[in-house]
């Protein structure tokens, strides 16, 4: 049944591409499995299994300054909980978790005078901030240029939703060694957990409905900084 569903889903996406006649942002394709794909023209047009609709921006949750304040607070909380930064290593979940980890790393370098080693994990296909498809994420690549054994590992992601991506990242870290602790830092926790996963550090708790989408925009990928609450209009 699952195989048949996947085949049907892929066929629908192929038809949508052809009917739309547009070039799509390949990097966003895996983030928008359920809600659809956005074209590069930036008009927010969405093509999905639920039909064709428009992503409507309901509210801006954080601007650039609010995000900086939240990440600075997370930086202080991480240092306080771990009694310094000497034993820390950071792992960003690509894509947006990676630059968030780098920003916190820069903050802690100012606070403690120590640069925390940073690595990254690439989780394939499904993202907790957008996907509602109940399939397990897969590890595409883990780039950890340090030994995790005995270290306090902090995982970073932009949005925490079902917890499936975080669980996959935890499993990836354990496949590389035996850390002392694994902690989770999240910019936005939108709720709706499907697994017993809880963030140790949260920039903002944001109650949402399942029809809504939390979009974190960073200049590295989006040309702007902010957190936005979106909804799919059919």
Language-model features, listed with the residues they occupy:
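Hydrophobic, low-acid, alpha-helix-prone terminal segments
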Residues: 8, 12-16, 27
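PRPP-associated nucleotide enzymes
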Residues: 5, 30, 42-234
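Generic short N-terminal amphipathic or hydrophobic helices
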Residues: 22-25, 45
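Intrinsic low-complexity/disordered segments
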Residues: 2, 7-8, 24, 54
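Cysteine-centered motifs
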Residues: 32-34
């Amino acid at each position: 049944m699952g195989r048949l569903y996947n085949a049907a889903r892929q066929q629908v996406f192929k038809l949508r591409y052809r009917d739309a006649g547009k070039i799509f942002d390949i990097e966003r394709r895996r983030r928008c499995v359920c809600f659809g794909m956005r074209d590069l023209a930036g008009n927010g047009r969405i093509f999905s299994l639920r039909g064709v609709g428009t992503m409507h921006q309901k509210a801006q949750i954080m601007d650039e300054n609010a995000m900086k304040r939240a990440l600075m607070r997370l930086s202080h909380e991480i240092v306080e909980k771990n009694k310094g930064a000497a034993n820390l290593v950071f792992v960003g979940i690509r894509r947006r978790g990676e630059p968030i980890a780098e920003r916190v790393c820069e903050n802690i370098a100012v606070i403690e005078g120590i640069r925390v080693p940073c690595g990254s994990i690439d989780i394939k296909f499904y993202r907790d901030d957008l996907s509602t498809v109940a399939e397990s994420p897969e590890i595409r690549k883990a780039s950890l240029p340090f030994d995790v054994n005995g270290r306090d590992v902090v995982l970073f992601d932009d949005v925490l939703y079902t917890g499936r991506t975080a669980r996959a990242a935890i499993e990836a870290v354990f496949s590389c060694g035996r850390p002392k602790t694994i902690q989770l830092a999240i910019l936005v926790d939108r709720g709706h957990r499907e697994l017993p996963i809880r963030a140790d550090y949260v920039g903002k708790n944001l109650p949402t409905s399942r029809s809504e989408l939390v979009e974190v925009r960073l200049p590295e990928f989006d040309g702007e900084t902010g957190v936005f609450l979106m909804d799919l209009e059919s």
